[in-house]
Amino acid sequence: MSDYKLLDRCLCCDSKNIDMLLNLNEQPLANSYHEEDEVLKSYPLAVNLCNECYHIQLTHAVNPDLLFKDYLYVSGTTQTLKDNMKWFVEYVQKDTSYTKGNSVLDIACNDGTQLDYFKEAGFDTYGIDPAENLYELSSKNHNVICDYFNSDTIGNKVFDVIVAQNVFAHNSNPKDFLDSCEKIMHDESVLYIQTSQAEMVMNNQFDTIYHEHVSFFNVNSMNQLVKRTNLNLVDVTKTPVHGTSYLFKITKNKISELGLLNHLEEEKAQGLYDEKTYELYKKNVINIVYNFRDFIDKFKIAGYSLVGYGAAAKGMTFLNLADVKLDCIIDDNELKQHLYTPGTNIVIKPNGFLKQYKEDDKLLFIPLAWNFYNEIRERILKTRDNKNDVFLKYFPKVRTESR
């Protein structure tokens, strides 16, 4: 496989009626944190909109080996995610005919944190993930395969529950993904697929557009995709994690679709199935980038140091598009610390680095992992007590908050 391939049909409804929505220029891979002098390759980063089902997808899909074999994102570093994982296990127990010893497969199990909570609840835990650097962590207490998920790699075992959290959108062939899931489901099995940024368009968010995220689903596009398989989309829930996420419930048997129908009507009322909504979204994205640059310039002139918090992939997209250089970025993930950000070459430091600033230094904090804003703010305030510090937020519009 070459480094990337063109996606010329809608991945959900298979239509060729797709048009460019946003072009974020060529950018390096968002999670390619590197040593200071390393030169990175850039790849096309743009999204098309399907004019039939309103699915948003990348124009090009990068070879997954370049993205996931050595993966520096770990899910167990934030309390917000851990709390959501605990909630999710309880949700699954209540939503299924759970009995102790039920089997669960976590597709893209990362460092195994979600599986840890399933194991605590009495599930037999299985995982699969291609990240070779995380295998020792994920396989410590669980049955884990270090590979990509497909019907060949997972074998013939059938599972009671299958979980795909924030991995389904990474796949450039989601229909094949669903077909592979069907082969390892029995009649009562439940597949839960979580996709992030359910309110991306309504809140003018664009920073989650990076090469790992091939697709940006709405309820209609997911429904059209599932209809092309032997499975059934039976319910949809919205959860607050990752800036509001969809949690899709998919089964072999067709059951009540009331929740699904309600969400379809809700999104239609919001304008998500109207081309005018996406024209406005495009204009708002441009305005946010220009306003962000203006705010940054004003604070630099006023003598503020510019400190990002959370070297999240979404932040890399934002900074590269805005072409803004910060003084440093703080991140609590040890795997990223002392490396440099892709494209902007900003050094990543641990939280303790903040103590090197004097008490009367003025800092402008930009929480790049804005989906963990409250947690980030709390960590900063525990480290610094300076009333002149300011927090900059940029969705759904650019604005500041005082300490």
Region spans (language model):
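N-terminal juxtadomain amphipathic helix
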Residues: S2-T80, T237
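Hydrophobic, well-ordered beta-alpha structural blocks that scaffold small-molecule cofactor pockets
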Residues: V92, K254-R403
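Conserved class I S-adenosyl-L-methionine
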Residues: K100-N110, L306
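Conserved SAM-binding strand-loop segment of SAM-dependent methyltransferases
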Residues: K140-D152, I348-K349
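A conserved beta-strand element that flanks and buttresses the S-adenosyl-L-methionine
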Residues: V163
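A short glycine-rich, Lys/Arg-flanked "PGG" loop and its adjoining helix->strand segment in the class I
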Residues: K175-V190
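Conserved beta-strand signature within the Rossmann-like core of class I S-adenosyl-L-methionine
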Residues: E188-S196, V390-K393
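Short, glycine-/aromatic-enriched active-site segment of Class I SAM-dependent methyltransferases
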Residues: I193-S215, V219-S221
